[in-house]
Structure formats: structure tokens, C-alpha cells
């Protein structure tokens, strides 16, 4: 009897800060003037006048993007991107790497549980879970490459041959012209804007309904910015506009509020989930049966491993799963699952009127729905089918310099300091002072401040 061949194990984990805007997994780290950050969009911070104008004013892009590479013992490399910037790199190596080195990359359930449970005392939601997500996606990319198969074939195969998209952006008429089956538009005003804001919201949605006609599905993204009474009133005032669904009307923590708005408008569809994390967070949303669609983000909730568990729960209640954005990572999931009827495309061009890669210039061959759809043929490459753009790779900043910085001398040393070494073997020379170029400028984001510093150290 032939023995089972030895499968490669995990040899190394590397992480990189992605320098610059418009590249990588942080959707909101884009140039000024982009519709995602600099148009009227109601947000949880819209209750304060100084944070209405731009979403960057309250820090939506503060973390930036990062990339994780996982190398197997045979030299095969899987990778994935997400949001988290320098703090993400720190946790990858200072905490999660211990569970990965020497492990069998096929043990995705085990590795997820170890990372999730080990970070439970400070995690469960938010950044720690988003970091686990990127590690998990890099593992799936590695597995696909080791087996020479696309990820969708590893998680059940194709449930359909064609993947249809709706488009989220500022101009539903443009989405219709580009071939998308429907469009979702962000709501501009919140309850703090009072009666005038309510009236403007209705007028805004009426304008877009008229621009696309009565038969084109129109959805509304409220981005966690409303409350129960406001949602009920707004939905009532828009009944004649035939809104296909109302998305993320309430705070992610107000799960009971969805019961109230569904009771008030049982004939309407309400959705949420992009800011929920792990199967535990989704359990109550699903069991309540107050949501018509759930919308997890595979780059945030725990990766492909956890998304499959959430989808299985939702399938038992016949609740469709329509992931939030996430490019190719979502596409492989959606095309493999029977209860995932379509996918979101988040318009990445500055004006939202053209189709560009979700991850900017990071990848050479990111599939994009140029006519509102993709097919399995577009996804038939090993792993997630992505290749890092050499130009973008040249701008990646290794976290070696973040994790092993050259010390700045604040007090005069009594003895000659020892020369440390980086993992690469290069000497780390003690510095006499913090160079001016490493000091954060006023208003700089966290990623800008740290990347400026590590660039200087890398050049030293």
C-alpha cells in the first residue's frame, strides 16, 4: 500500500506595511476627493459637525493596509492583504506567528481556533480578528497553490458558473450603465440633521430612483448611523421608492433594534453584518430572523475558515449571505455556495463611474466585473489567483524594521551599546537622535508616521 506523501509545513511568516494610498486591503485609504471619503455620507460620527465633511477627519483610514506572506517548507508562498498597517504586523509576529511555524497549513480550523482563543482576552472583534482573517486568507491561498487549484474548488467547488454583481457607489445611474444588476448608494444625512436632513434624504433617494427607473434594484447603505425611530420613519417616507433593502441602519451592537424595525416594516428587507465578527457575533443576528440578508466581510470576520461556518448557520435559516466587498477573497466564496446569490462590487474609482481593481495597484491580475459579472473561468488559477505587482512590491516595507528598530538614545549611555541584528542578519546601528524625517507631521495618520520612520531606518 502506497504511503500518503508528506505535506509541506509552514516554514516562515512575513508581513509588510503597504506604503501609499489606493493600494491594498484598506478600502478607505484613498486620495483626497475620492467619493468614499469626501462626499456626504452619514456615519456614526456625523453627529458632530466637524466630522461630517470627510470620513478621514475622524480617522477611517488611520491604520492603512498590510500584507502577510506564508512560506511552506517546499518554498511555495501564499499571501493576502487587509487593513491594519503597523499594529497588524506587530500582532502577526509577536502573537500569532507562534501558532503557525511548523504547522500543517491544511489545519485551518485548528489554526483559527488557536489564534482566536489566544486573543480572546483582548480580541474577539475588530482589529485582532481582522488580522486573523488576513492570516487565514494567506493560508487558503497557500493551500490552493500547493494543490494547484483555485480556492473555490477547495471549499465545495462551483455552485454556479456565473457570478453577478451589484455596485456600491455615488451614482446608481453609472452602475446601471456599467452592466451591474443593481446599485447601492450611501445615505447622506443622519438623525442629528433633524427634519431638514430627513427631507434631504428622501429627496436624494427619489432623485436616484428617477435616474435609474422603476425596475432597477436600488439599495441604501446607512453605515451604522441611524437609530430605530429614524429608520422606521425614513423607510415609511420612502415606501413609494421601492428600495430593495436598507443596509446597516443601526449600530452593530443594537441587535435587538433590528427586531423593532422589522416589526414596523415586515414587508421591507433589512441587512447588516459587515462590522460583525466571528460565528458567535452572527449567531444572534441569524437566530433572530429579523434580517433578510447577512453581509460578513471575509477580510474582517475571521477569514474564509470562519465565513464558511457563518454561511452554514445562515443556510439552515434560508438567509442569503452576500459578503461585503473584499474582491477575489469574496468571489471564490460566493461562487462556491448555494445560498450566496450575488456579490458586491465597491466602486474604486474616485468618481465611482468606472470599474477598477478593488485592491488598487497591489496585484497584476485582479479579476474585476467589467460588465457586471465574472465566470468560474476568471477564477481558475491556483489559490486566489493573484500576483503581486512588482511595482507595488517595491513599495512594500518589511515589518523587520518595525519589530527590530534601531534604538534612539535619550540619555547618555554609560557603556558602549551593543550592536543588535535584524532577522535578515544586518547590523542595527544605534542612533544618536530621532531623525527629523521620522517624526510625525501634524495630522499624519498612524501608518504615515510609522512608515516614514521605518523607511529611514531601512535606508540607514
Predicted regions and their residues:
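Conserved, mostly hydrophobic/aromatic
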Residues: 10, 75, 96, 135, ...
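Short beta-strand elements
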Residues: 66-72, 367-369
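Flexible C-terminal active-site loop/helix
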Residues: 5-25, 29-53, 326-443, 447, ...
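Shared catalytic-loop signature of beta/alpha-barrel
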Residues: 35, 48-49, 242, 253-375, ...
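Glycine-rich, aromatic-flanked loop segments that form ligand/cofactor-binding clefts
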Residues: 127-130, 136-170
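Metal- or metallocofactor-binding catalytic centers and their adjacent structured scaffolds
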Residues: 54-56, 71-146, 350, 415-418, ...
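Metal-dependent enolase-superfamily TIM-barrel catalytic cores that perform enediolate-based chemistry
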Residues: 156-261, 265
